[in-house]
């Protein structure tokens, strides 16, 4: 295959398939060009998070948080210290990864250090077969005593999957029940019940949920636990996406994304579920109108 293109006047030239705005030679960046490219990429990743996040619920304008409210935040969920950045599909990465806590620090949030310390003592495994959430026993009386000083509750919930890493329909929970992994597990329910209790008794002024997942979870529980606001943040990426999450919480930017999937109260309510799973019969009746 020729690397040259013949022009109308008969002369030939080497075609330019992509002209980078950072370098004339994308295979040989200078140090300054590489720095400029990386800075632009980080800004793009942050803006992608800001423009893709979806506000699923916002009762009584619970979001955005005021300047006073971001100084008194209690962060719940093991995902707070072990965020979900991207799915298992594909590759890519970044020379630096900004965590959720680092992003909050950069925007002058003050949060409950007792909660963070309790989560960091745990070593939980999270993958497409497991749900990594702390047991309610970590919220000791000494931890609960700190809630009144940090009266804005932000709960982060995550699921992790990707290509060839499908989430299971038969998750074996610690209470011996079996359910889809898109539903809450016992530890998550216990945590949400605890936050709901302190929201009802007036200790917490707001109850915010962040869905840090690329998978479509069941969300009927948002009403069950009295959640004030819920923000879908997806996977913010392996770089600066969590800066965007922090800015969404403060209202410096507005969530402008739209859902491409239906967030149902039960994933089993879809008509397609009647034909889902391992089919052992030789004949199958198709039911989608073929």
Which positions does each model-derived feature cover?
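C-terminal non-catalytic regions of proteins with extracellular/luminal or membrane-system context
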Residues: 1-290
């Amino acid at each position: 295959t020729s690397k040259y293109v013949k022009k109308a006047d008969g002369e030939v030239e080497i075609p330019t398939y992509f002209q980078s705005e950072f370098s004339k030679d994308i295979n040989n960046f200078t140090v300054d060009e590489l720095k400029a490219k990386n800075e632009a990429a980080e800004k793009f990743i942050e803006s992608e998070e800001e423009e893709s996040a979806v506000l699923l619920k916002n009762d009584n304008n619970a979001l955005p948080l005021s300047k006073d409210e971001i100084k008194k935040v209690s962060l719940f969920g093991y995902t707070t210290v072990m965020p979900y950045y991207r799915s298992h599909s594909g590759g890519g990465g970044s020379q630096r990864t900004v965590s959720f806590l680092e992003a909050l620090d950069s925007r002058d949030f003050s949060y409950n250090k007792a909660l963070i310390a309790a989560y960091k003592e745990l070593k939980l495994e999270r993958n497409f077969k497991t749900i990594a959430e702390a047991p309610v026993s970590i919220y000791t009386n000494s931890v609960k005593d700190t809630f009144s000083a940090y009266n804005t509750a932000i709960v982060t919930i995550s699921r992790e999957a990707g290509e060839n890493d499908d989430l299971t329909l038969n998750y074996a929970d610690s209470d011996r029940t079996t359910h889809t992994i898109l539903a809450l597990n016992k530890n998550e329910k216990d945590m949400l019940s605890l936050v709901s209790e302190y929201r009802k008794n007036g200790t917490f002024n707001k109850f915010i949920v962040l869905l840090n997942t690329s998978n479509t979870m069941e969300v009927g529980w948002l009403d069950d636990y009295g959640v004030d606001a819920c923000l879908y943040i997806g996977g913010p990426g392996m770089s600066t996406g969590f800066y965007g999450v922090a800015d969404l919480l403060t209202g410096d930017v507005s969530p402008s994304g739209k859902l491409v999937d239906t967030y149902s109260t039960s994933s089993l309510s879809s008509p397609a579920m009647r034909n889902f799973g391992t089919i052992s019969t030789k004949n199958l009746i198709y039911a989608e109108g073929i």
